[in-house]
Amino acid sequence: LDKERTFWIGTKGNGILKIFDYEVQKNISDCRSEILTTSNSGLGSNAVYCIRESNRNLLWIGDEEGLNFYSYRERRIKKLPLWIDNEEFKYIHDIYETEDSELWLASVGMGVVRARIGGTPDHPVLEKLQRYVVNGGEFGSNYFFTICKGDSLNLLFGNMGYGVYRFNETINGLEPLTTHKYENMNLNKVVPIIKDDADNYLIGTTYGVIKYASENSYQLFNAKDGFLNSTIHAILRHSSDNFWLSTNQGLIN
């Protein structure tokens, strides 16, 4: 839901559904809507993985083919090609813009990119691109699905297969959040990460939710605790101590 009360919904194959003047109490069928695809907009792909607000006059859009942005001034989507290490950066599943004009991108297959945002408030230009990978850049090791803002831990990145990484400014690279070896390897298949008010990280995996406080203090919640299903796709904060979880078999509150 953006500043104009337009509800943007990205789909995996059918582009973007825009619902105008959205209100929770309204029936969606009563709202004016529009579908944006590669055939009627500047989208690079109809598989749209993330839509994020910006401090500038635009929205960031990550899709199968890379990065796009929606210009509020021009009322249209534009593709923003990213080339690094002689290849185009694609499969963008999460985007995080910092207060000091840095943009972080998480890719499922190509690692993480950090860039400085230049240009104008209406038309960004990405500069000083740096790419961060694990295991020598091997494609299957660099499935990064999510970015979470930490405090002293800096940014956290969820990896499907290798757990949670954090960015270390000193070494200018990614390092594992924990050296703990879980007995069930599915706990290293991380999709969402969110922080609660007690400074715990709620880490969604394919084997439940890890409530992580520190290297030696964490709890696991999954189907054994009454969850409908242990595969967690998303975590949404409802209030300070109330969260919604989406699973393969429905929602959990």
Predicted regions located by residue number:
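Carboxylate-rich, polar loop motifs that coordinate divalent cations or form catalytic acidic clusters
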Residues: 1-253
